[in-house]
From Swiss-Prot:
Residues 122-141, 276-302, 331-497, 522-545 are annotated as: Disordered. Residues 339-348, 394-406, 535-545 have a biased composition (Basic residues). The gene is dnajc21. PANTHER family: DNAJ HOMOLOG SUBFAMILY C MEMBER 21. SUPFAM superfamilies: beta-beta-alpha zinc fingers (SSF57667), Chaperone J-domain (SSF46565). Keywords: Chaperone, Coiled coil, Metal-binding, Repeat, Zinc, Zinc-finger. GO terms for molecular function: nucleic acid binding; zinc ion binding. Residues 129-141, 283-295, 372-388 have a biased composition (Acidic residues). This is DnaJ homolog subfamily C member 21.
Amino acid sequence: MKCHYEVLGVKRDASDDDLKKAYRKLALKWHPDKNLDNAEDAAEQFKLIQAAYDVLSDPQERAWYDNHREALLKGGVSGEYQDDSIDLVQFFTVTCYSGYGDDEKGFYAVYRNVFESIVKEEKEHSKDEEDEEDEFPSFGESESDYDTVVHLFYGYWQSFCTRKNFAWKEEYDTRQASNRWEKRAMEKENKKTRDKARKEHNELVRQLVAFVRKRDKRVQAHKKLVEEQNAEKAKKVEELRRKQKLSQAKLAEDYQEQSWTAMSELEKELQQMEAEYGQEFGDASDSEENEEELESRDIANVDGVDAVMADGAAEMDDYYDDLYCPACDKSFKSDKAMKNHSKSKKHREMVALLRQQLEEEDESLSQNCAEREEDDEEEDDDDDDEQNDTSKQKLSKRQKKKKRLQKPVNNLPEAPETVSPVPQSTEEHLSPAPDSGNTEDTPVPSEDPDDGVKPDGQENTNQKSTAKTKGKKGGKDSKKSSKAHGGVEAAPEKEVNLRCVTCQYEFTTRNKLFDHLKSTGHATALSSSNTSQTSKKKKDSRKNR
């Protein structure tokens, strides 16, 4: 089979117009009607021209032909392909060459021919003219220069990549596919086969290059030369280092200390200067004695160092306190900075704000204290009003009963005054008094004959003290107390009740008495009977409200 491009006489990258022009020209030349003297040969050539144009004029047919051109030219895709490329396996032995000369059977001549044949095959499978014009480095001869020939050759061929497409290795003919899905599957399998064959060919060529390079005398000579150069460089570096050490050692031996750097000379000069200053100020004769005295003083004052340090620390604390601004919450390092800060506008604003806050706090505290005192006074007034109301009601009943049950009791002795303990609760614990609300069986003693002569203030005091013992359940307590005292009415004890049991100090108001008990701790515990009586009085006062 002949190549279609060669039949039409065009290049492989020819355009459709070029193909059409070439086809018309050849068709007119080889048409059978115009070649009657050689009709059979003309007809055969005309068939080839027409078949080539039919394939190349169709884009799909042309693409498939370009991919399978080599296979078609060498037997077709049906498996009858005969690969006429060079067999590289036979060149992996040392028996393929004799010696390392440039003769026909020498090392360099044999492998030069091998790589030239590989280059020829690669150019045949190139699609573009640019690929054909690419230069493949030559293997060279036994005397070729390493840098210009040998190094370039091995640099290219050690990374060799073939241009062959290995279309003859395909297993399926995509033209025989019944549908596009089957065609795609065939193309996928054919691509895998081509890639595998291409990879194997590249690896084979690279292995051959490694085999040749290992035995190339030019490479060995260059390697030896490089080793010698490296050894010579290392030797020179070592020699240079040794010379530097010797020169440094020599400089160290020849070094002399300068007079201005000698410490001994400096010490002498210092001593001389001290002696001169001592003579000038009259301290030279006593310098040694002064030193001894100073040492003794230092030893003697060891114990006083701690005290001095403590005093210094206290002074430093005072100093730093003076450098602290509480209004701005800032500390300063010097008196000047503190003074500048105290003159600043921001500092004055902060001081005014702080002063205002302190005044507001003082006002709020004083107001709270005043309100608390007013509340206490109001509570006292309320208690007094309640007691007055209750006493008025009960005194009115007593007066009624006195008119009916008044009997002469002038001969009865007065009941002795008793001091009751002060309770801890807000209610006062008073001595029990006879209740005017008792039944008629209980005799009510008459007042003392001198009662009519008493002033009004005394009478009111007796009425208030009697009214405090009244309540809803106060009658029972009054009965018990009257029986215990033989039915004699107790004397008024209001003034006695505002007295501290512990220190016997009298107070004008209950608030003062309670403040005294809280501050001194003179409060005493009540008995169970007194506590129950006090709670009952509280309940009675609440209900009467």
